[in-house]
């Protein structure tokens, strides 16, 4: 219901929104994205991708876009598998691709629909996953045969566990033939027992760093224990632990609206990923400021890790690391020029950074 209004958008409205997004992407120096789609609106997703593809054919798409087909219910598995195959065939221009199935495995923590291993403290409920491990395994085998990839919305600890279990089952059956790139996105809460399984199973861990201040203004340190207890509430967003375990960690914005695009900024995400705090020095809305750094401080990233997660690691997630993600002879010359050295810039206030020059395939586009 949240997105029902988008089905009424005209083609002109879609193009206007897409062009605004492109302007923002160019300004921030974003040159490659994964679009995670709207749930239950694959028709709208298809129209957006068609708009992007037409821009690409006209030479007006200076961003590489990897789209997806969205699956939310087991009864639509067959339809979705056919849909993602169709998207791959239909969207295959130089900068517009579509070779990924997106699954919404659970909901969100704020309304207690995120799937948990340990129950919520106020209700005693655990939420639920949309699929079980056996269904995930079957989907993976189909995707593997077709040469397609999987991206999964996983907020709660049980949601990512189901994906990990499904990958384990599929790998056990397929062995060295398994080649699906599997990404778990968001990862608000993780059970200790699953942290090292990402690296072991080759599952990509995608986080949304601008949430890592606690994703609620004021005092998230006191807010989240009322939902999931102090131990779990103070060990959320365990990206550094994942990184150190050897897992491939990538970053995202989870932007779903066309506001002022502030939370589309990778520099905002980098700041919060490094500080786990939104304060008066952060280029963000005052209502989102928090009282202190969100625990644990041990999960704060350094600038090198933030840059790698946005560049070569992101390219690996999309399967385009042979052409993108690093400045290497033979690769696309996608790079940015800054007035400041990002490696030595202050962490607090890092969100005010912006490139002075943006190059896409060797040409200045800003």
Predicted feature residues:
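Divalent metal-binding segments
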Residues: 1-85, 103, 108-159, 176, ...
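Short glycine/threonine-rich loop-to-helix capping motif typified by GTGT followed
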Residues: 39-59, 191-197, 201, 263-266, ...
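Short, isolated positions in well-ordered beta-strands
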Residues: 110, 365-366
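An acidic- and aromatic-residue-enriched active-site/binding cleft used to recognize and process polar
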Residues: 38, 68-72, 155-157, 187-189, ...
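His/Asp/Glu-enriched, well-ordered alpha-helical/loop segment
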Residues: 5, 16, 141-150, 158-182, ...
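Non-cysteine beta-strand/loop elements that form the S-adenosyl-L-methionine
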Residues: 93-113, 202-213, 275
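Phosphate/diphosphate-binding loops
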Residues: 60-102, 179-192, 197-204, 217-250
């Amino acid at each position: 219901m949240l997105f029902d209004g988008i089905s009424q958008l005209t083609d002109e409205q879609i193009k206007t929104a897409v062009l605004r997004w492109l302007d923002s992407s160019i300004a921030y120096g974003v040159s490659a994205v994964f679009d995670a789609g709207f749930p239950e609106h694959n028709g709208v997703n298809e129209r957006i991708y068609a708009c992007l593809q037409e821009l690409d054919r006209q030479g007006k798409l200076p961003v590489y876009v990897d789209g997806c087909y969205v699956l939310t219910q087991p009864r639509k598995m067959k339809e979705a598998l056919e849909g993602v195959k169709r998207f791959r065939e239909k969207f295959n221009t130089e900068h517009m691709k579509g070779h990924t199935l997106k699954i919404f495995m659970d909901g969100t923590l704020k309304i207690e629909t995120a799937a948990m291993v340990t129950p919520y403290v106020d209700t005693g409920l655990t939420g639920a996953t949309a699929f079980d491990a056996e269904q995930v395994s079957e989907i993976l085998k189909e995707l593997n045969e077709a040469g397609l990839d999987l991206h999964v919305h996983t907020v709660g600890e049980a949601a990512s566990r189901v994906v990990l279990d499904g990958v384990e089952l599929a790998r056990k059956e397929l062995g060295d033939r398994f080649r699906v790139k599997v990404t778990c996105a968001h990862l608000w809460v993780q059970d200790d027992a699953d942290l090292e399984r990402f690296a072991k199973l080759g599952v990509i861990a995608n986080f949304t760093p601008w949430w890592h201040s606690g994703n609620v203004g004021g005092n998230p340190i006191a807010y989240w224990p009322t939902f999931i207890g102090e131990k779990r509430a103070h060990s959320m967003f365990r990206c550094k632990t994942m990184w150190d375990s050897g897992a491939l960690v990538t970053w995202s914005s989870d932007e779903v609206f066309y506001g002022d695009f502030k939370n589309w900024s990778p520099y905002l995400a980098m700041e919060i990923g490094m500080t786990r705090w939104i304060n008066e020095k952060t280029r963000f809305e005052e209502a989102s400021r928090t009282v202190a750094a969100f625990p644990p401080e041990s999960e704060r990233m350094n600038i090198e890790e933030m840059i790698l997660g946005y560049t070569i690691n992101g390219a690996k997630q999309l399967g385009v690391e042979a052409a993108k993600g690093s400045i290497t002879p033979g690769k696309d010359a996608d790079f940015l020029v800054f007035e400041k050295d990002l490696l030595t810039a202050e962490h607090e206030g890092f969100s005010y950074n912006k490139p002075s020059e943006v190059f896409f395939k060797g040409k200045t586009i800003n």
